[in-house]
A protein has these predicted regions:
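Active-site-proximal alpha-helical scaffold in enzymes
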Residues: 1-12
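C-terminal catalytic/substrate-binding lobe primarily of soluble NAD(P)-dependent oxidoreductases
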Residues: 11-259
Length: 259
């Protein structure tokens, strides 16, 4: 997502006004009513911590969990998914390198998934603090992770695709422009070619590409930097060498939701 923001700012816009990361999927898992496709620890941290929004005139601020719902139409046959504010690092990183007015991150969790997370929080099962149960001292969140299925072993039961992308609004050649830059992982493909379910594979492939660019010297820098600091073109080219390609979708005017 950070790389897409960098590419859009450098190649698709004269002015960037707003960057909105939008991730969603149409994944289903046979035999489970609730089975996160990622670590429940990470899921709870991202979804139950207050989401962060960045605005140039206001800086960073938090909002309510699952706030500002909007329906986003994802490409590659995924279709419409309701997305809500979720805490994620792009909101903190992108404004450091991309001149814009607003940055958000929204994820397509689905109403049922949100209800599960709210129930865990209500029951205290999201807590990291250990409690005494008989002679054992345990963290409720560790118990939750132990009873839920291992996401890495769900691939053979999963169907569908997951999409990670960046929706950018701004000005190009004197006219308003909105584009969605995205990467789609099909679970059938990732299981067949890599032996990994789509969500985990999509999460892992980008750091692998970045490390290769650093190792080869195509990316060079001193200090601590996010992906949006670097030239996006070598990254996107190498991503294609891993038999996985990105897309760019022109969005119609007026499709950007009001804050």
């Amino acid at each position: 997502s950070d790389i897409f923001a960098r590419y859009a700012a450098d190649h698709l816009f004269d002015e960037v006004h707003e960057v909105g990361v939008r991730d969603g999927s149409n994944l289903s898992i046979d035999g489970y009513d609730f089975a996160p496709t990622f670590s429940i620890w990470t899921t709870i941290e991202e979804c139950l911590n207050p989401p962060i929004v960045w605005e140039k005139d206001r800086g960073l601020y938090t909002t309510d969990c699952f706030s500002e719902p909007e329906v986003f139409h994802f490409p590659a046959g995924i279709g419409p998914v309701e997305c809500v504010n979720v805490e994620h690092e792009e909101v903190l990183l992108i404004p450091r390198e991309v001149d814009c007015s607003r940055v958000t991150f929204k994820y397509g969790l689905g109403a049922e998934f949100i209800d599960w997370l709210k129930t865990f929080a209500y029951l205290g099962l999201d807590s990291k603090e250990k409690i005494q149960v008989g002679n054992a001292s345990v963290s409720p969140r560790d118990v939750l992770a132990a009873v839920l299925p291992n996401p890495a072993k769900l691939g053979h039961l999963m169907h569908g695709k997951t999409c990670a992308g960046t929706w950018v609004r701004g000005i190009y050649d004197g006219a308003p422009r909105e584009v969605y830059l995205y990467h789609v992982a099909d679970n059938e493909t990732t299981m067949r070619e890599w032996g990994s379910q789509a969500v985990l594979w999509q999460t892992a492939v980008c750091p692998v590409v970045a490390l290769e660019l650093l190792a080869k010297g195509d990316w060079k820098a001193t200090g601590v930097h996010g992906p949006e600091h670097f030239d996006a073109v070598p990254f996107l080219n190498l991503l294609g060498d891993y038999s996985t390609h990105h897309g760019i979708l022109e969005m119609g005017p007026g499709m950007w939701p009001s804050p």
